[in-house]
Amino acid sequence: FKRSGTAVLDMVTYDMAEAVRGANHILISVQAQGFEEVFQELAPLLENGQTVSIFPDNFGSLILRRIMRDKGITTKVIIAGYDSLVYGARLVDFNNMETETDVVNITYRENEIRVDTLPSSDYEDYLRIVKEIPALDATQLVHGDTALDISISNVNPLLHIPAVVMNAGTIENWGIIP
């Protein structure tokens, strides 16, 4: 699988309302500690019929549904959570979005990825709708057992925590020890 080319974005904005108004699909990739803030702003903006896909889920689907419930929001949306990211990407050349020369390298793509919706009964509808998302066209979606299963199956804690613990001395003494 290899693609190269230029992606042209229809919109770049810091205004969440502008970004989600009329959108069919809302794809979210935020570190888990940012879910609460992002979802507090997003929840009242959601429109009937939209899908929200969270990469990786890390309990994000549960958090978004809780916020919607607490705010009394009854908008009919499908919320899906993925166990990881579909692509590994790094910004290589950044010009503060002022020119057309920003460069992103995508270094890997998942061949298959686990996903479920909350509630799980929305999964079949989600599968039909998600075919419209070009970023997922080459990735096989595997149905997870539940949103909870998806959230606890992310491999990041297994990969990153041991590395941090093994480097704790270096991290704590960064800049002190020559």
Question: Where are the regions a protein language model picked out?
Answer:
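Short glycine-/small-residue-rich Rossmann-like dinucleotide-binding loops
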Residues: 24, 30-32
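Substrate/ligand-engaging "lid" and interaction regions
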Residues: 86-178
